[in-house]
Amino acid sequence: MKRDFNEFKEFIKGKNVAVVGIGVSNIPLIKFLVKLGAKVTAFDMKSAEELGEISKEFEVLGVNLELGKGYLDRLTGFEVVFKTPSMRIDSEALVRCKNQGAYITSEMEEFVRYCKGKVYGVTGSDGKTTTTTIVSKLLSQEGYKTWTGGNIGTPLFSNIEEIKEEDKVVLELSSFQLMTMDVEIDVAIVTNITPNHLDMHKDMQEYIDAKKNVFKYQRENDLLVINDENEITKNLDKEAKGKVVRFSSKKTEGEDAYYKDGKLYVHGKEVCKKDDIIIKGMHNVENYLAAFLAVYDEVSIESMKKIAETFGGVHHRCEFIREVDGVKYYNDSIASTPTRTLAGLKAFEKPVILLAGGYDKHVPFEPLAYEGYEKIKAIVLFGVTKEKIKAAFKRLEEEKGIHVPVYSGESLEEVVSIAKSIAENGDIITLSPACASFDMFKNFEVRGDKFKEIVNNI
């Protein structure tokens, strides 16, 4: 049940509130809480110098700042704590606050709790951003006022009073955002679940349980969209409280949306041809099938077809950069898991020179080697995980006698140079790292932009 935002305004006014993390979503949150009359203290590991102008702006607004080394030691004595998504609820600082009687929450939890519009929550190990974007575009095409947020778009909580009951809200939700989510989401989409973020989660089960929160608090009139080709998601119907619909790119029997003979169908109706979809690859067919099911009650087949035939994709996802000396370069920096890299490789019609590696999320790389070797002409590795990935390909050769040439470099510039030196006319070089970027870059966008800069300077 959606609650009246006036309740929150009354609740937060005059409260002693802590906000942990001065990042993209929390900056507008802090300003909004000040506007609502809260006494706000913002916490961050960065110094005032590192934060720059925003620290000065907050001081003018009367926001107290607790910054730098040991900043969480000072997280005590607050009535309300807004945590950053990646902060575990069982962290020492939050446990201390909870024991002191603090109400612990996050920007996304409060947004969903009080949002008047219909909420579509998209989660999964791969395909979240593209599926979220497709759902948003489908609803907008049909004429709905559509808001997009969560991991993408803009922070929405500070706009909550502008969102009307007839509006649609599409959220990309990570496992971190979902770990403490205990509110109803009207339409939940789970694209797939494979090993991911095991550096942050205690184990795979905790990761799965976090994902389940996207539909755990639904009621009988709500909708859950699941991937029938994924071993974990296909069984989620057993725990669903609302209506469940399924999609598959491989079979048609019992499916609510499916792919058959080059065409996409939803509830038995043909929507479009696979070859007419601008963004290529079977993983994008699955993203479209999921999105079609999510919006079926609101969006016409005509609008679905139009978006499929005109939407050119999201930056850093199998994005063509340029062709140099007969070699095509693609940026797939979003691929931060082996399964997402495999999906990207399958979008190409020939084996590619793959640039991979990065931050270690403690996921296995054997699937990349054992399922991807036919699509890899050579692999050039970089980052913290390069030895782990190299070991997976060595194991492939020892066990199956399949050799994939493996090279490695220290920087992105070096691996591009190596790839360029081994490429022949007609080859494809793609950055599809199978890892997060945090060992070398702030995020996957910065990594992708750097790659594009290097390629454009060849």
UniProtKB/Swiss-Prot annotation:
Coiled coil: none annotated. It is an enzyme of class 6 (ligase). Pfam families: Mur_ligase_C, Mur_ligase_M. Keywords: ATP-binding, Cell cycle, Cell division, Cell shape, Cell wall biogenesis/degradation, Cytoplasm, Ligase, Nucleotide-binding, Peptidoglycan synthesis. It is found in: Cytoplasm. InterPro entries: Mur-like_cat_sf, Mur_ligase_C, Mur_ligase_C_dom_sf, Mur_ligase_cen, MurD. Transmembrane segments: none annotated. ATP binds at residues 124-130. Its EC number is 6.3.2.9. One of its GO terms (biological process) is cell division. The keyword Cell wall biogenesis/degradation applies. The keyword Ubl conjugation does not apply. Pathway: Cell wall biogenesis; peptidoglycan biosynthesis. It catalyses: UDP-N-acetyl-alpha-D-muramoyl-L-alanine + D-glutamate + ATP = UDP-N-acetyl-alpha-D-muramoyl-L-alanyl-D-glutamate + ADP + phosphate + H(+). Its main location: cytoplasm. One of its GO terms (cellular component) is cytoplasm. GO terms for molecular function: ATP binding; UDP-N-acetylmuramoylalanine-D-glutamate ligase activity. Belongs to the MurCDEF family. Cell wall formation. Catalyzes the addition of glutamate to the nucleotide precursor UDP-N-acetylmuramoyl-L-alanine (UMA). PANTHER family: UDP-N-ACETYLMURAMOYLALANINE--D-GLUTAMATE LIGASE. This is UDP-N-acetylmuramoylalanine--D-glutamate ligase. The lineage of its organism: Bacteria, Bacillati, Bacillota, Clostridia, Eubacteriales.
